[in-house]
């Protein structure tokens, strides 16, 4: 995957480049994230990458084979992010956060909190009451599908990797997608975990709608002064 290289700037001026990648396979984007992280300097601006992936299951570093129940024809990729197995597919907003956490003076826990808070604030604008859990990263809502099911449902998953003091990977927010592939895994390693999406809760109906709000929320929380958007050709 070829990306335009931004002009570097003094590290004292927090800058953010937001790349709109459209729909892409997982592997080339992952390879590009690793290459970007390995080649960046102390003056390289941080980047957010907005993407929808072709259907894929990704295993995190803590992933266990028994949580892949019946992947079938959906490919499985062993990733280097934190966490366990999840599903990516069209209609899901994936936001990769390539942040120099040392320069931003953020701990990893603080960055995770920023991701969760940005999602919660975005959902609140649509009247969705969501929350984070200290023992299970991600964003959840009380399950409205009936008492016979789980008492809560997961809307968003998180997984990060830190290399050279910089983050890559990020978050996945279910927006308006086919949810059945989640039934073929134990999402994030939890058997029977209920999954839901914003379109089923009266929230954003499209990835474009969701990402505009979420990017703005997260950029504000981290404290960027200048934000530049660019669309990348596939």
Curated annotation (Swiss-Prot):
Gene3D superfamilies: Bira Bifunctional Protein, Domain 2. Signal peptide: none annotated. It is found in: Cytoplasm. This is Octanoyltransferase. GO terms for molecular function: lipoyl(octanoyl) transferase activity. Substrate binds at residues 81-88, 157-159, 170-172. The gene is lipB. Its main location: cytoplasm. It holds the Pfam family LplA-B_cat. It catalyses: octanoyl-[ACP] + L-lysyl-[protein] = N(6)-octanoyl-L-lysyl-[protein] + holo-[ACP] + H(+). Its EC number is 2.3.1.181. The record marks 154 as: Lowers pKa of active site Cys. Catalyzes the transfer of endogenously produced octanoic acid from octanoyl-acyl-carrier-protein onto the lipoyl domains of lipoate-dependent enzymes. Lipoyl-ACP can also act as a substrate although octanoyl-ACP is likely to be the physiological substrate. The active site is at 188 (acyl-thioester intermediate). Pathway: Protein modification; protein lipoylation via endogenous pathway; protein N(6)-(lipoyl)lysine from octanoyl-[acyl-carrier-protein]: step 1/2. One of its GO terms (biological process) is protein modification process. In the reaction, the free carboxyl group of octanoic acid is attached via an amide linkage to the epsilon-amino group of a specific lysine residue of lipoyl domains of lipoate-dependent enzymes. GO terms for cellular component: cytoplasm. NCBIfam families: lipB, PRK14342.1. Belongs to the LipB family. It is an enzyme of class 2 (transferase). Keywords: Acyltransferase, Cytoplasm, Transferase.
